[in-house]
Every structure is written in C-alpha cells, then in structure tokens.
Amino acid sequence: MWLPLVLLLAVLLLAVLCKVYLGLFSGSSPNPFSEDVKRPPAPLVTDKEARKKVLKQAFSANQVPEKLDVVVIGSGFGGLAAAAILAKAGKRVLVLEQHTKAGGCCHTFGKNGLEFDTGIHYIGRMEEGSIGRFILDQITEGQLDWAPLSSPFDIMVLEGPNGRKEYPMYSGEKAYIQGLKEKFPQEEAIIDKYIKLVKVVSSGAPHAILLKFLPLPVVQLLDRCGLLTRFSPFLQASTQSLAEVLQQLGASSELQAVLSYIFPTYGVTPNHSAFSMHALLVNHYMKGGFYPRGGSSEIAFHTIPVIQRAGGAVLTKATVQSVLLDSAGKACGVSVKKGHELVNIYCPIVVSNAGLFNTYEHLLPGNARCLPGVKQQLGTVRPGLGMTSVFICLRGTKEDLHLPSTNYYVYYDTDMDQAMERYVSMPREEAAEHIPLLFFAFPSAKDPTWEDRFPGRSTMIMLIPTAYEWFEEWQAELKGKRGSDYETFKNSFVEASMSVVLKLFPQLEGKVESVTAGSPLTNQFYLAAPRGACYGADHDLGRLHPCVMASLRAQSPIPNLYLTGQDIFTCGLVGALQGALLCSSAILKRNLYSDLKNLDSRIRAQKKKN
C-alpha cells in the first residue's frame, strides 16, 4: 500500500526539483569560472601608499562608476567575494564600506608601529588541492599564499583543582586522532566513533546548500514527512546538540570538554550548538591550520583589483543610510551619508553584506520592515556572542620569546555550559574574576613575512567572551570618550587575562610594550556588528534547524535585494565565501558550484595530460 505512494511522492519531488533547477539556473550570464585564472603569487606589496590606493579609497560622488549593475553594502569577505564573482561575470559593481579601510574582519590596523588582525586567526583546508583553496585561488587569481601553522595547531589548556592539563591538537587526521587517544587511552573506541561521525556529518554539508535552492514549501513538506533528517546525516545532526551527541557516545566529562574545546570559533556552548556546525569546524581544521602570508589584509588587497578591472570600485567612509525602494517596493539603489548630505546611488540590484539585523532593522524603510518575510527571518535568529579583543605589542622576536604559531584555548571547568551561563549572568563588577575561557595566539609567529616587516618585535591577541549588556550604558558615548569608568571596567578583563597568559608564558614578563583592548562596543563601531556580535546571527540549534537554514537564503523578501556573507551560511572566511557563492548564483541564475566543479575537473585532466 505504501510503496506506490512513496514512488508517486518521489516522482513528484523529482519533477519539482527539475522545474526548480531550470527556473533557478536558466540565466544567460557569462560563466565567471570559465577558465583557470590562477598565476604565481606576486611579491608581497609593503609600500603603504600602494596598499592605501587599494584598501582606503574614500567615497565621493564623483568616484562612483557610471552604469552600475550592482551595489554591495559592506566590504567584509562575503561582500568582496560576491562582488568579485559578479565582476568576473562582467558586472560593474560598487562596494561601499562604512569604515576607513576595506576588508571587514579581514582588515588590519596599526598600533605602536605594529600590525594587528581583527578577525582572521587561522583558516583550515587551505592546502593545495583543497576545494576551499581552489575557490579562493579562482577569485583572487592565486595571489593569496597560505602558511601552515606548526603542529599542534591548537592546544586546549584545562586549569583545574588538580593542576593544569594540556591537550594538543595535531595536524593531519592520523596525528590528530592519535593525540586524543594518548590522552584518553581508556576511550579509544569512543574517539573512533566520534571521528567517524564527524566525517559522515561534515560530508553532508552540501545538503545545507541544496536547502537554500529548494522552494521553502518543498523544504517544509520534506521536513514534516521526516525525509530531511532521515536521508541526510548533516541535517539530522542539525537537530542534535553537541552535548547530546557526546553523551550518547558515552564520553567521559573530561573527554566531552576536550572534544568541545573549539566551540568559541562559532560562539555557542555544547548544550546549545548543533553537532552539524561542530562537525564542520572539526573536519575543517583536522588537517591543520593556515594563515595568510603577509597578514589578513592580503585577502581584501587581492580581491579588490578583480572588481576594479571590471569597471567597479570599492569605496570606504561610505555609510549606507538606507536601501532605496521604488513605487513597486523593489530595491533600486542605496542612500549614502556624505557629511551632512545624502547621496542617492541607483542600480538594478542591491546586495547587503551588512547582516540580517542591520539590513532588515536599519537599512529598510519602515513599511518594508513589516513584511511577513522580513519579520519571519528576524524571528528565527538572534545576535550571537560578544567578544572583547586585546591587542598586545611585545618586544623581541618569536625566537627570542619562544612564541609558537599554535592557538591556545584556556578553560577552568569541564562543564562549559554551566561555566558560561554562570559567567554571563553575573553582575558585571564580578565578571572579570570569573572568566570561563580565554583564547590567545601570537599572529606574528604565524606569518613568515613578519620579521622582514617588523624586525625585533612581536604581537599577541587575546579574545574574551563578554556580555554586551555589561557595556550597554556606554553605547551612546563617542569612541574614545566613554570615560574612566568604561576604561577601568574594560581593563579589568585585560588584567585578569594577562595574568593567565604570563603563567603559561613567563618569559613574556617585562616584554610587554603596550596593551589595547576593544569591547563589544568597539566591534559595533568598526565592524557595524549589532551588539558586538562578531559572528552575526547566533549559530545555535534554532538557526541550524533545516527549515531555518532554508529560509536564510540569498534572495530576500524584497525584490532585487540580495543577501551575502556569514548570516546566509555560517561564520568564518569559508562560511562567508559560501554565502557569496549562493548570492552570486541567485543573481546570475547560474549554478556556480557546478561551474567550479567543471573547471576543477578540466584543470585536473589537463595536469594528467602534462
């Protein structure tokens, strides 16, 4: 009885998918990935004026190119990558950035003669031959050079009543697994099951991409029938918490903590994070970490020329006040604040890389914010974790100070959820004394070009989770004029964290030249991150639910307004890149994933011939 019904449903679904595919990818736009554009990396450009011409072109009305095809709001990598892909397809694109320098979380800034990154601490899967490296090479013409971190690439430090324990995460699958088993010899079978599950789940990530192409009613029907989670391990794991899966595997509390150590890279504790998100990140880094040679500003520096060569531009100091809508409610341009005046820029397509909250709550006119589709999307997500970043100038080279390229994650409790919940619910005056976790690293030790550019000196960065509410009373104050109470409170986190680092690296005593800290308010100012949430919308179980994932797509409820970046897929450079591919596919009406696969196959076939 059921077999004919199932077969009928399968035939109908196949027919729908065929119709959807033809409708989505029926465009006649040129293929942006028609040929291999990779070339050997050019020498690192260190001339400040040359870099300024690319990264710091200030907005003025006469700098706006004529006959624009697309305007992109925000120059984070999700915006730049989408603009570059569209430029490769012949589109003239203008990217507008509110900050003084392009790049978003990829931009760098100078402090006391040294350079600091703002968001790129390490990237996985950037070895030659990986799909992520291949896509970036095609966007930047192979000009990004990636330096591998040493092994172990991460060390989890657990400070407990019985002393300190360290758990190294070694590069390469075999070494990674062996390192875990050496620390937990009684739980080898559990570790094997965990790794197998990570690989199975992460291999299904394309299913999340497929969801964003299917019509929402089809996704909802498949979800109600239980078919999404039945046939996709990734989507099944999107409904299970990390803590739930580790408990089902039978891991001890200490092993659960160690396997969960990387959660700060997506900002959600084990009870509230989806195992699918965790599996993606673990698999992403299992072969090791990489860092852009020359620093993270290289990413924007080598993406912007692709946009410019197609007649486009990337302009800074360009705060977009609103998305312009025509009488039919379609996006038709943007309004940019220039001094006390507004400059209207008209174009057929607007792309927002400003995130869901900025786009829907601040950039849309009031009547558009009330649209059911807009309200529905905002109702399914919330801002993520806030961070305080600490930037430290050190006297001495990495050899002098014995600085590794390894990242450190320091914890004080195996129950990470309880520790974080207790911490964020504390009165702010007590919080600095109970920091539950700390990330720190030495960016200067990761970059092979550092010593040539900044001889005799080094840098360190620390990241501390902090509640936005603790800083909220100063949100209306101007940057740099928030008063002594703000500085004292912010510095309480710095002092507490520095004491931890100096215990692990006592050789740094007396080598600190300067310390600068940025609170969630700093992220809000420089990155336009609502509530200082550097990862955008929270990556919790709610956001990773298959139906919510499907609804967070490039096509917005406003015709001709598209979304790109980390809110469309996941956080991180590669997540933002996926958002850009989804956005560009929707605009060009091309399956860019298929285009990339075809190009990769042709390149591999050519290499075999040679």
Curated annotation (Swiss-Prot):
Give the location in the cell: Endoplasmic reticulum membrane
Instruction: State the UniProt keywords alphabetically.
Output: Endoplasmic reticulum, FAD, Flavoprotein, Lipid metabolism, Membrane, NAD, NADP, Oxidoreductase, Signal
Tissue and organ expression note: Expressed in liver; expression positively correlates with obesity and liver steatosis. Expressed in adipose tissue; expression tends to be decreased in obese versus lean individuals.
> Required cofactors, per record?
NAD(+); NADP(+); FAD
- List the catalysed reactions: all-trans-13,14-dihydroretinol + A = all-trans-retinol + AH2
Coiled-coil spans are none
What EC number(s) does its UniProt record assign?
A: 1.3.99.23
Q: How does it sit in the membrane?
A: Peripheral membrane protein
Q: Name one GO biological process term.
A: retinol metabolic process
Q: Looking at the keywords, is Plastid present?
A: no
- Asked if the keyword Lipid metabolism belongs to this entry, the reply reads yes
Q: What InterPro entries does UniProt report for this protein, alphabetically?
A: FAD/NAD-bd_sf, Retinol_saturase
Q: Read off the Pfam families from this record.
A: NAD_binding_8
In the record, which residues are listed under signal peptide?
A: 1-18
Its Gene Ontology molecular function terms? all-trans-retinol 13,14-reductase activity
Q: What class of enzyme is it?
A: oxidoreductase
One GO CC annotation: nuclear membrane
Q: Which family does it belong to?
A: Belongs to the carotenoid/retinoid oxidoreductase family. CrtISO subfamily.
**Record function comment:** Catalyzes the saturation of all-trans-retinol to all-trans-13,14-dihydroretinol. Does not exhibit any activity toward all-trans-retinoic acid, nor 9-cis, 11-cis or 13-cis-retinol isomers. May play a role in the metabolism of vitamin A. Independently of retinol conversion, may regulate liver metabolism upstream of MLXIPL/ChREBP. May play a role in adipocyte differentiation.
- What is the name of this protein? All-trans-retinol 13,14-reductase
Species source reads: Homo sapiens (Human)
Primary gene name: RETSAT
